[in-house]
Curated annotation (Swiss-Prot):
Family to which this protein belongs: Belongs to the calsequestrin family.
Organism: Mus musculus
Name of the protein described by the UniProt record: Calsequestrin-1
Signal sequence, start to end: 1-34
Annotated membrane topology: Peripheral membrane protein
Encoding gene (name): Casq1
PROSITE patterns xrefs: CALSEQUESTRIN_1, CALSEQUESTRIN_2
Post-translational modification: N-glycosylated.
Knocked-out gene: effects: Mice are viable and fertile, but have a lower body weight than wild-type, due to a reduction in fast-twitch muscle mass. Fast-twitch muscle from mutant mice exhibits slower contraction kinetics and requires more time to achieve peak tension and to achieve half-relaxation after a contraction. Fast-twitch muscle fibers from mutant mice show a strikingly altered structure of the calcium release units in the sarcoplasmic reticulum with a strongly increased number of ryanodine receptors, plus narrower sarcoplasmic reticulum cisternae.
Keyword terms: Calcium, Endoplasmic reticulum, Glycoprotein, Membrane, Metal-binding, Mitochondrion, Muscle protein, Phosphoprotein, Sarcoplasmic reticulum, Signal
Length: 405
C-alpha cells in the first residue's frame, strides 16, 4: 500500500505533487539574498543516490554506516507519474547531499527489477523508506520530505540511550511531554542490566527516547532505585515503573509494546503514518488544536486533563493534530471532514473511508469543559456516537431529495 493511501484511500494524492515541489525546491526568497548562516541547501546536481541491485548491494552496505533505501514500484509511463518519481528522487538527493559527511547513504530499490535484492533485504512495503544501521532495520513511517527525513536520520545516528548526568539534562528530560519516554538508573555502563536496557532501546530507536543515569543524585530526584526503569506515557506526569527489577531486554520490550499506545498522542511528521495505522477497531478519535492559539491551547489543556483522568482505560486513545505542523493538509482536512480548523475540533474518523462525525459545540464562544468532553468520549466508546450515524443522516437527506423528485 502506498504511503499516501494511508490517510484515507489515496485522499492525500492530489496534494502530493505540489507538496513535493515545495519540499524539494524550497520556499522562494522573494528577491532577498541569503545571509551567511541562513543559506538553505540547494541541490548541487551531483548524483549521490544509488540504484541498488544484485551486483552492487553488498558493496553499498559496506560503504555506509547508515543506509536509507526507498523501495518503490516502477513509475508508470504517464507524465504525472514520471514527474512525481523524479521529485521523490530529488528529495533523496537533497537529503543525501546534506548528510554526505555523516556517513549516510541513499539508494533506490525497484520492486520489479530488483525483486531478488528486496527479498534478501526484507523489503516488503512499496513506497517505503527502510533504514539500515548495523543489524537494525527501521521502517521510516513519516512525511516524505527532505527536512523531516534528514532530522529522522540524524536521530538514527545518535546512541539509542541518552545519558543524564546533571541538572540541565534532567530539566530537558522533564520538559519532554508529547512523546513516550523511559529512564533507568544503573550502576555503570558495564552493568549487565544497563546493557539489557540498551539492547531494548535499539528495538525502538529512534521513535521512543530512552534515557539513563548513573548519578545517584539524579536518581533520587526521579525517585528511582538502582536498576529500576520508569515508563512515562505521553502527556502524563506520573510514570509507571516496570515491575520485577532488574529487567531483561525481553521484559522491557514487552512492557513498552503493551503500553506504547498513549491515551493522548500527537501526530508528528516523522511518525505520522505509524500513528495513523495504529487505530482501534478501524476508527480514530481525532482532536485538532493549534497549541499557539489561545483557544487551541485551552482545549489542549482540557484534553490533557481528560487523558490523565482516563489513562487506565485501554480503549481510549486520542490523536492530537496541531494544524500548524501540517499546513498543506489543512485544506484537505477541512474539505474531507467538513470542519473549520481555525477553531478546535474533536471527532471520530473512520480510517478506511475517512468518514467522520464531530462534536457539536453548543456555544462557539465557550469550549467544552472536561466533564462535557468525558461525556462525549464515553458516548463514543459505547458506540452511541459513530460515523455510521452520519451516514444514516446522509441517507435520509438522499431520501428527501428522492421524494422531491
Amino acid at each position: 500500500m502506498r504511503a499516501t493511501d494511508r490517510m484515507g484511500a489515496r485522499a492525500v494524492s492530489e496534494l502530493r505533487l505540489a507538496l513535493l515541489f515545495v519540499l524539494v525546491l524550497g520556499t522562494p526568497r522573494l528577491g532577498v539574498q541569503g545571509e551567511d548562516g541562513l543559506d538553505f541547501p540547494e541541490y548541487d546536481g551531483v548524483d549521490r543516490v544509488i540504484n541498488v541491485n544484485a551486483k552492487n548491494y553488498k558493496n553499498v552496505f559496506k560503504k555506509y554506516e547508515v543506509l536509507a533505501l526507498l523501495y518503490h514500484e516502477p513509475p508508470e509511463d504517464d507524465k504525472a507519474s514520471q514527474r512525481q518519481f523524479e521529485m521523490e528522487e530529488l528529495i533523496l538527493e537533497l537529503a543525501a547531499q546534506v548528510l554526505e559527511d555523516k556517513g549516510v547513504g541513499f539508494g533506490l530499490v525497484d520492486s520489479e527489477k530488483d525483486a531478488a535484492v528486496a527479498k534478501k533485504l526484507g523489503l516488503t512495503e512499496e513506497d517505503s523508506v527502510y533504514v539500515f544501521k548495523g543489524d537494525e532495520v527501521i521502517e521510516y513511517d513519516g512525511e516524505f520530505s527532505a527536512d523531516t527525513l534528514v532530522e529522522f536520520l540524524l536521530d538514527v545516528l545518535e546512541d539509542p540511550v541518552e545519558l543524564i548526568e546533571g541538572e540541565r539534562e534532567l530539566q530537558a528530560f522533564e520538559n519532554i511531554e508529547d512523546e513516550i519516554k523511559l529512564i533507568g538508573y544503573f550502576k555503570s555502563k558495564d552493568s549487565e542490566h544497563y546493557k539489557a536496557y540498551e539492547d531494548a532501546a535499539e528495538e525502538f530507536h529512534p521513535y521512543i527516547p530512552f534515557f539513563a543515569t548513573f548519578d545517584s543524585k539524579v536518581a533520587k530526584k526521579l525517585t528511582l532505585k538502582l536498576n529500576e526503569i520508569d515508563f512515562y506515557e505521553a502527556f502524563m506526569e506520573e510514570p509507571m515503573t516496570i515491575p520485577d527489577k532488574p529487567n531483561s531486554e525481553e521484559e522491557i520490550v514487552s512492557f513498552v509494546e503493551e503500553h506504547r499506545r498513549s491515551t493522548l498522542r500527537k501526530l508528528k511528521p516523522e511518525s505520522m503514518y505509524e500513528t495513523w495505522e495504529d487505530d482501534l477497531d478501524g476508527i480514530h478519535i481525532v482532536a485538532f488544536a493549534e497549541e499557539a492559539d489561545p483557544d487551541g491551547y485551552e482545549f489542549l489543556e482540557t484534553l490533557k486533563a481528560v487523558a490523565q483522568d482516563n489513562t487506565e482505560n485501554p480503549d481510549l486513545s486520542i490523536i492530537w493534530i496541531d494544524p500548524d505542523d501540517f499546513p498543506l493538509l489543512v485544506p484537505y482536512w477541512e474539505k474531507t471532514f467538513d470542519i473549520d480548523l481555525s477553531a478546535p475540533q474533536i471527532g471520530v474518523v473512520n480510517v478506511t473511508d475517512a468518514d467522520s462525525i464531530w462534536m457539536e459545540m453548543d456555544n462557539e464562544e465557550d469550549l467544552p469543559s472536561a466533564d462535557e468532553l468525558e461525556d462525549w468520549l464515553e458516548d463514543v466508546l459505547e458506540g452511541e456516537i459513530n460515523t455510521e450515524d452520519d451516514d444514516d443522516d446522509d441517507d435520509d437527506d438522499d431520501d428527501d431529495d428522492d421524494d422531491d423528485d
